[in-house]
């Protein structure tokens, strides 16, 4: 039995609307194709995270096809971006930076002068030789946003992305920086601002890479080297009011140290010592999900960034250090606290995640010699390391490796508390160097407990004591120890395990849920922050 004619017409109309709607949402999602209509010679960017970046495709013979990265350079990128309506290019990319998604290639050996209005007007080898290129050689660009921030930087005329003549954006125009007094601190700030966390490798003068075609904007830039942005540097000469010759012979160039897998940087903080943690992986900066993120992870990040340690690892709100379009690279980082680089830690989920950017991990690193803050560690463990049962060197863990105790005021009060936790009735302190304190091995500790203060009352726990934790590894008085007697059961909720040592002796380890406040003191290294 058929449907009434009117109902059939409604059904066909509904189907038509649905089909049109489906066809209009082509490429919606994480990998959008930003570009122009399918007209001969038009171009588009695909697989970028924003509309101003991606692999370059050109429309020819009724099909979109890629551009091979042979001869691909900054002038090609500038023409590409200007054709798409952007002010110019910030960066050019080779080797399928945005992924090996392009399967058909129309153009190779593209070589623009920079004054062309369309990419097809540039010199290139004839269309239609797709077998000469493959998906790993797709050319890409990052275009300057249409509303470029004051003081933005870019490099032009270099053969590789991390070098070139330095240009800055000021009052609506791109122009050069005069090389007067431009040194390593200035280059470090410039390179880090442009995404190269390791800073500058070398400074090039006298227009080494070629000359800017814009005005000469900055002269006598004077940075300390710790600034996050060149606009934070001292500028004794007003922009555009330079004392350089009115030619570009003094244009400064930079060679930035290329990023290395596992490099880290801190973004959008009030200074270089704090911010959202980003890690360099697979040739791109990305964030880390804060699932499982703790003080041990933050401590490794801060040391890798050139600081002594972290003063804050959690309790951030998503908006504290802003949001980013960068990918989320990983989650559940598991550090012991002694690693030199974050990439040396265990990545429980590998390079995968199931997070959103509101969960990006952040840190605040120590900056001053007298930085004193309060943290609340999740778990504190104490162990006695020696050749005999119940006697030896005292070591403490805050979840980031084991630390030695250096305390000139070490007394029987503290020893009694430690022994009580280890399951003994009594305890006596021992000074460094005494026979009872000798341990079977040395300890490479990431920190030193440079003070434990207990009252010595009956059944006192470590959560009732105060600790000062220092990343300064010097200890004039030597490690402290204890001699415990009167073995008994450990306090409720704690356990002891012999994890090493000779017969009749060993290392007694116990887990202590210590929700005390610990006063953390860090010492700033020579030279301040910044990644080595």
UniProtKB/Swiss-Prot annotation:
This protein's record includes keyword Lipid biosynthesis: no
Cytoplasmic side: 521-532
Disulfides per UniProt: 68-133, 81-143, 112-122, 178-244, 191-256, 223-233, 289-355, 302-365, 335-345, 406-475, 419-484, 454-465
InterPro entries found in the cross-reference section: SRCR (IPR001190), SRCR-like_dom_sf (IPR036772)
Cellular component, GO annotation: membrane
TM region positions: 492-520
Membrane topology recorded in Swiss-Prot or TrEMBL: Single-pass type I membrane protein
Keyword entries, A-Z: Disulfide bond, Glycoprotein, Membrane, Receptor, Repeat, Signal, Transmembrane, Transmembrane helix
Glycan attachment residues as annotated in the record: 78, 115, 459
Record's subcellular location: Membrane
Taxonomy, superkingdom: Eukaryota
Domain spans labelled SRCR: 43-144, 153-257, 264-366, 382-485
The UniProt record lists the keyword Transmembrane helix: yes
Signal peptide start and end residues: 1-30
Family annotation (Pfam families): SRCR
Ranges in the topological domain labelled Extracellular: 31-491
Role of this protein: Receptor for the egg peptide speract.
Protein's name in the database: Egg peptide speract receptor
Organism expressing this protein natively: Strongylocentrotus purpuratus
Lineage: Eukaryota, Metazoa, Echinodermata, Eleutherozoa, Echinozoa
């Amino acid at each position: 039995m058929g449907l009434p004619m009117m109902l059939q017409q409604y059904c066909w109309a509904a189907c038509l609307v649905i089909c049109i709607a489906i066809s209009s949402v082509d490429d919606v999602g994480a990998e959008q194709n930003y570009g122009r209509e399918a007209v001969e010679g038009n171009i588009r960017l695909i697989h970028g995270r924003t509309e101003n970046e991606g692999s370059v495709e050109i429309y020819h013979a009724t099909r979109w096809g890629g551009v091979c990265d042979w001869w691909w350079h900054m002038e090609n990128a500038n023409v590409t971006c200007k054709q798409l309506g952007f002010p110019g290019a910030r960066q050019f990319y080779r080797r399928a930076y945005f992924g090996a998604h392009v399967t058909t290639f129309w153009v190779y050996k593209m070589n623009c002068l920079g004054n062309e209005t369309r990419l097809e007007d540039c010199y290139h080898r004839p269309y239609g030789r797709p077998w000469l290129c493959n998906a790993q050689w797709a050319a890409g660009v990052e275009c300057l946003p249409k509303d470029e921030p004051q003081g933005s930087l870019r490099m032009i005329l270099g053969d590789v992305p991390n070098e070139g003549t330095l240009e800055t954006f000021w009052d609506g125009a791109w122009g050069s920086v005069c090389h007067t007094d431009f040194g390593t601190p200035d280059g470090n700030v410039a390179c880090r601002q442009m995404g190269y966390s390791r800073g500058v490798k070398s400074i090039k003068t006298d227009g080494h890479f070629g000359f800017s075609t814009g005005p000469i904007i900055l002269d006598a830039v004077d940075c300390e080297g710790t600034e996050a942005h060149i606009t934070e540097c001292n500028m004794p000469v007003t922009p555009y009011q330079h004392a350089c010759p009115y030619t570009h012979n003094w244009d400064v160039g930079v060679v930035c140290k290329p990023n290395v897998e596992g490099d880290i940087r801190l973004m959008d903080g009030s200074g270089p010592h704090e911010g959202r943690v980003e890690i360099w992986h697979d040739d791109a900066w990305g964030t880390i999900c804060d699932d499982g993120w703790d003080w041990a992870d933050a401590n490794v990040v801060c040391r890798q960034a050139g600081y002594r340690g972290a003063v804050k690892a959690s309790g951030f709100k998503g908006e504290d250090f802003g949001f980013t379009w960068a990918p989320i690279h990983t989650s559940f980082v598991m550090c012991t606290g002694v690693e030199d680089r974050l990439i040396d830690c265990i990545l429980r989920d590998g390079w995968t995640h199931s997070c959103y950017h509101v969960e990006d991990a952040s840190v605040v690193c120590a900056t001053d010699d007298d930085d004193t803050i309060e943290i609340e560690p999740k778990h504190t463990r104490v162990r006695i390391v020696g050749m005999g049962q119940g006697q030896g060197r005292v070591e403490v863990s805050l979840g980031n490796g084991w630390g030695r105790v250096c305390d000139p005021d070490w007394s029987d009060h503290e020893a009694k508390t430690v022994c009580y936790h280890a399951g003994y009735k009594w305890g006596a302190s021992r000074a460094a160097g005494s026979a009872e304190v000798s341990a079977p091995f040395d300890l490479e500790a990431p920190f030193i407990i440079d003070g434990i203060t207990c009252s010595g009352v009956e059944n006192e726990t470590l959560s009732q004591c105060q600790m000062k934790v220092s990343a300064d590894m010097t200890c004039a008085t030597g490690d402290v120890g204890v001699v415990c007697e009167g073995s008994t059961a450990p306090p409720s909720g704690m356990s002891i395990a012999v994890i090493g040592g000779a017969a009749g002796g060993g290392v007694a380890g116990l887990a202590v849920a210590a929700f005390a406040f610990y006063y953390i003191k860090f010492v700033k290294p020579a030279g301040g922050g910044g990644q080595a």
